[in-house]
Amino acid sequence: MDSEQWKTKFEIMLENVIQACKETKAKLVFFDNTYMYEKNDTEQFEDSKFIYDGIKSTVRAKMADRLVTEMENPDIDVMICRAPEFYGPNKTQSITNSLLFNRVKNDKTALLPISDQTLRTLIWTPDASKAMALLANQPDTYNQTWHLPCDVSRTYEEMIKLMEEKLHKPVKYKVIKQWMFDLGSIFNKNMQELKELLPRYHYDNKFNSDKFKKKFPDFEITTFSNALDDLFKLEKKYYSRKKR
């Protein structure tokens, strides 16, 4: 999450990768996020304009622009695969995984950033990996940007209600308001790093992946319900034993 690391190293790393791909005739498939998109409720498409503010957003926009430029270069095949916030099994790292799912797994109160009423679009990490592999192995998918496929958007409140149904128990949660993050960031570096990303949580997040879905209509997107079954499979057995 260290912004200075992003600022000083990420573009250099990308340049090295581009040059290595050119020298070895390798194709470049770049996994990207949505930091460079405008942080409001405007629906996000592959050709949405970059409107960014902050170190991370700026770095990501520059990297994406660099790759788009290379898409015109006949010496390299480039593809950008873009995804919204992750959620997933094992050690998946994301704000929602850390503050919601992992805390519920550990019988802690979930912490929801800014609002439990705005729509969130999340991508299941195994789906993201499979979709990238599928795109990478097609002859006609390079030199363009793709939004990776996601299930329907939900509010945090809707997610928690479904979790309660799955776990057969109440899920406690607390909404962390903007002023709380502002105060905490004075004393905590991790909260300082998080502040740049918070504006997106004030609005419905509308990430459109219709381009992918039309190209691959048979691709099976993991539903949020099925993802929860995976995330909480051990906990489900535990709570079942407790109820006896």
Where are these regions (language model features)?
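A conserved pocket-lining segment of Rossmann-fold NAD(P)-dependent short-chain dehydrogenase/reductase
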Residues: N102-I123, L135
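Conserved beta-loop-beta element that borders a ligand/cofactor-binding pocket
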Residues: N33, D65-N90
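Glycine-rich "substrate-gating" loop/helix at the edge of Rossmann-like oxidoreductase active sites
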Residues: P84-S94, I114-P126
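Active-site "gating" loop of Rossmann-like NAD(P)-dependent oxidoreductase/epimerase domains
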Residues: T34-I55, T69-I76
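A short helix->loop->beta-strand "cap" motif at the edges of active sites that frequently abuts
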Residues: C21-L28, D75-I76
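NAD(P)H-binding glycine-rich loop region in Rossmannoid oxidoreductase-like domains
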Residues: M1-T24
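Mid/C-terminal beta-alpha module of Rossmann-like enzyme folds, strongest
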Residues: A131-L194, S209, K214, E220-F224, ...
